[in-house]
Amino acid sequence: MKKLLLFMCIGCSVLWQANAQVKDLIASGQTINTAGKASTTFLDLQQSLNWLEQEFQVSIAYQDEIVKAKKTRAKMDSFESVEQALTVLLQGTGLKYDKAGERFYIISQKKPSQVPSLNSQETVLVNSFPASNKINGGSTFSGIENAKVEKRRIEIGGRITDENGSGFPGVNILLKGTTTGAVSDAQGNYVINVENENSVLVFSFVGYVDQEIVVGNQSVINVQMEVDESNLEEVVVTALGIEKSAKSLGYATSTVHSDELSINRTPNVMNALQGKVAGVSISALGSGPGGTSKIRIRGQSSISGQNNPLIVVNGVPIDNTNFGSNPGNNASDSSIGVRGGGNTSDGGDGLSSINPDDVETMTILKGAAAAALYGSRAKDGVIMITTKSKNDSKGIGVTYNLNYTNEAPLDFTDYQYEYGQGEQGVRPTTPNPTSGQWSFGEKFQPGMTQVLFDGVTVPYEPVRGIINGFFRNGQNLTNSITLATSSDKGGMSLSFSDLNSKGIVPNNTYNRKTINLGFAYNLSPKFSFRGNFNYSHEDNENPPNIGQQDNTIPVALYNMANSMPLDVLRENRYDENGNEAVYSRFRNRTNPYFTLSDQFQNIKRDRIFGNIALKYYLTDWLFVQGRVGQDYWSRDQDYNNFPTGQASRAPAPAGFVNGVYTQEQRRFREINTDFLINANKKFGELGVNVNFGGNHMQRRSDLNSVQVTDFVVRDLYTVQNGRAKDPIYDLNERAVNSLYGSAELSFQDKFFLTGTVRNDWFSTLSKENRSILYPSVSASWVFHENLNTTGWLNFGKIRAAYAEVGSDADVGAYSNVLFYGINNNLFGGQPVGGPNGTNLPNPNLRPMRIGEAEIGFELSMFQSRVSLDMALYRKLTTDQIVSAQISDASGFVNTSINSGKSENKGVEMLLTVVPVETKDFTWEA
């Protein structure tokens, strides 16, 4: 019996002890071995929390000692939200979490120490940690431990708020010169004991300015933290849509955000950048709300070809064809004119279909090194546009914008008003010598008269304000509404906008409707997708003529005699036969009011572009991405180049009525498919970031056009009404295959070295010359942390770069290929086949090459109130593709050769000063 009682006592003791050990093991997260089963593998809790921070882009604050040695066995790829992950990870650990902000969480023990009241004079528990130890990475607390200390004579408390006045959790409060400190709670409250009135409290948080406050006779100290803009890690969207830290870039870039674009809203989003970016020239052609923006980055690189930068939206290139700059029939060219010669109008460009309110950021990659990963298409720089994909804050938001602008014609003329209309010192006294253009007549005298082209005698006196008298004030009215959502998993943005414009030319109107959808979601911690789709419809009626062209409104007005009354031209634009009344002996000057009423051009364009990208993280430092994007537009237009009855046209044959009418249908499609593999890992103070990818670009464009003349019925502009018809069908296809890669090495997050390489294979060149390889190398050094500048220098960086790119952009899809067609000219009554075109193919034609070197530096001073960005660059373009005339005996007229060479060099400087900056007002110059 005694033995039985002894065994029972021993057994109970063992069971009780085992039970206690099991509880301790569960609380600590350690494994328990059971008979017949293998031990379970647990993950370190602190590593799991670090992974959550990176995956969900949140901050999780905790004391190291409370998570030290704790384990978890949860599968890290199975969480759909931060809250779900923390709930699972903290099970059985004796810890809990509190959500202290939008993306901020605090982990603490379930039974926290009692917090003393402000009036308590008893011994209290305070946090003690080294004075040099701050929050690591903006989230975790290191070296904080609870220690029992002696009674303090003064007890201080208060509330800490952020820049918006909200409670700020996780702020370090340190008693200067000691290891005594505290941390603000979820509401921003804190309590700390100090030694005397001379004690100094230091309030600190990563990304915010440290504040030191002398206690004095205060018992409550409230503090508002200020953002340290000098330490903000600016992220820049670079080539291929890769996001990189701005300080790591060894080349010049400029980024403009949506709030800067909205200050000066313009129908064409690029015009809002005028004067904002150094080294970039942006000029509107003054051709109305649907007009083209001429963009040049660091000058011209091609002598005879196109010099437009590549436009990239959300990582995928889109077409930016300019309609109206130069005549041509190739829809894949950078600029397209109208058939019939002369009277070219500005029909807009690809950027005009983008609603400025949909743009989140615009980044300009200026040099060859910045754009090298885009290869041949980026020889003139790249403009990266990122559109909105979610709400700014969590939840659902609706934004409505109403924008109105007024445009007035710019009258920069400075005419003389001493002598009037006429020639050789004689004013018009009969209709015949009326010049209508020259003001070389007699000197103005009171009571003098002149005879105009209509035979009417009017006063011989100055006519002022011709420009403002003819043109009107333009108006632009934009209504846009956006529905956006945002959550822990992602968000979306859906917008609709309607732009109605009236140009300064009385018969010019423009309407644009756009729908934009952007979205980005994390399906799991490892798998995410994002996409963007944009649809636009444009109606452009009678876009103004551009340039120095005969028979156009601008030329007629600016060359008009200074005593020609506008009302006479308006009321007498037709003669007795219904033709234009000749007001000038110069036949290339058309009455501007005749042009308004009898010449027309109608343009309709529908466009849809977008892309979708899928990204999967194989590990926390390695991901793969696949993306496909498409840009498609259709453009229909009809116009009459020379209205029937125009005085500048030769007399029509008997039975015919003169004039030219054209109908055109253009279709364009470009598909880009690419993949990208990225590895980004740190080895102590050394960081490695490697990218490898490839792209396939396929482009197709076609043109259906018919031009008719010799109308049966005058002023009836239809294809059926023209006796002579000239149809055209033009098809262009081209493709480029590419492989590319980049590698970046960083040391101490201060020294950066980056190299890139890309190889393109062009379909437009011969097999021997279609492959071209172009490299780039860049370096930067962030030096301000190594200098003792007593706080006046917030940021300093030196950078240098060199790159080479090539291009086949000046080679037409088939201009270097011999092909045959059926000629319109008949021989013996039969159509004849033969070589199509007058350009002799050159099998040795090579892509043009551009080598560019640049050095520069960036400075930010006095709490970012003064910033300076300077760059020096030299760009050498060789093997330019030009057209050379050859002997007619060859059967051709010209051939393309590599001959041209040009050099661009310059200095760029952007100085930004913020003289006044308050909570409600900022003045930046």
What is each stretch, according to the model?
Residues 328-349, 460, 562-576, 718-728, ...:
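Surface-exposed acidic, glycine/proline-enriched linker/cap segments
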Residues 284, 292-295, 545, 785-797:
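Short, surface-exposed recognition loops and adjoining beta-strand edges that mediate ligand/DNA contacts
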Residues 242-249, 454-461, 585-589, 646-648, ...:
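Flexible hinge/switch segments at interdomain interfaces of large molecular machines
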Residues 1-516, 521-523, 528-530, 609:
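Short, small/polar-rich motifs associated with maturation and membrane association
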